Amino acid sequence: MPYFEVNFDPFIALGKITNSPVSNPLNLLSFVESVGAAGISFTYGPETGQMNNVTLLRSMTNCRINIRVPVDMQVLQKAVLLRPDIVTLCDMEREDTTVQIPSKSIKELVDTVLNIEDLGIAIRLKPDVKQLKEAYQMGIDEIEIATNELAHHDKQTPFLECLEKITHTIHIGIKNNLRIAAGGELDRRLIRALNEVIDVEFISVGKALLSRSLMWGLENTLKEFNEVIDIR
């Protein structure tokens, strides 16, 4: 059964233009956990404010804390000092924020984190078996498979082909004892489609969670997504 991870990045982005309570993740932490979420994530940066105080976050929630980090050594080192549970390397210059491997610079970043006790390292990849195998050889703790492409298909055949590519990659990862997460423009329909064919460690949801909560309320939306993720 997958765990539910709430990606707070869209909420933080909303906070730049409004002071609504829903735009401040600190207001939502204990509430998010109470409705069944097991993880939270956000991208490291000055605009995240108090979210960078992981000690404070731990006093407010038992959720796994996943900090998304750009492929930059200085930024990674700063994020590591916060001592989250896991850091996920992402390429913020790419539309789907995936990294590409093999890459000498990515390997150097991974090696920086690998031997740190009680800190996991993840990378965000396209659903590509070759890159997955590269990640395995690097000793990565967890792979987040980008599902963005799935959201862009509105016709059945390309949708099913994309879904097959994603599930095949995830199957290979699980077979090799890799922890696999999935995220990227996921809504309830896409989560149901994934859950019908594959099991992952975490399912990360952000934009769809925010947009639906603005219409139907955060509590109802969180419960709704948690139920969809929880159904196997």
Where are these regions (language model features)?
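Glycine-rich phosphate-binding active-site loops on the catalytic face of alpha/beta enzymes
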Residues: 87-95, 142-154, 198-218
